[in-house]
Amino acid sequence: MKKTIKSSKILGPLFQLTAGSAIAQLITIMVSPLTTRLFTSEDLGIYTLILTIISIFGPVLNGKFDMSIVKSKDHDELVDYLNLSLIIGFLFSIFVSVGYTVYLFNNKVIMEKVGLIIFVILPIILMASALINTLTSLNNFEKNYYLISKVYVVRNISQNIMMISVGLIHLGVIGLILSQLASLFFGIKSQAVSLKKELIFM
């Protein structure tokens, strides 16, 4: 009986997270043939290259203090890790943005496609990613797996809808990047509800 209860506690959250990821991936697969028609291979290539920065640095933007949030033993420790995660995430986002900006500025092909606005968008994307890392870890600490899964699906759906929209009006690479940026903000309010409470009562 105890083993059954323990298994259900493990499998339940695992199913919720896996289901959310599976739904998001399915949506991306379904939309993919359309996006390849709306954007040139060059647009998609440059977009992927720019977003590589998120794939590489995204998981470590918070100095792994976001992972410590999940293992917090008490409220004071939780608040300390939340603050550290947010501050380090903000600072490291700026640091990475400056370094990557130098690379982009010296790449004429990319600059012709995206323009100077990328120097504004890139730091915002990284800061939003750092914030999401912190919020997701807080939701994980609270065992709010349904919210994590739901937000992941909502972001994926919104991004794909916006990608199609900007593709139809031929915004190219900058449209793809803007759709990525905008989608990050979907669900942040829901995820941040408990963050406000924790920081208010610190």
Please tell me what each predicted stretch does.
Residues 1-2, 9-13, 32-36, 112-115, ...:
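Generic detector of short, locally flexible boundary/turn motifs and exposed helical patches
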Residues 2-9, 39-41, 55-87, 134-147:
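Transmembrane-helix boundary and interhelical linker motifs in polytopic inner-membrane proteins
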Residues 8-63, 88, 97, 101, ...:
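Signature of the first transmembrane helix
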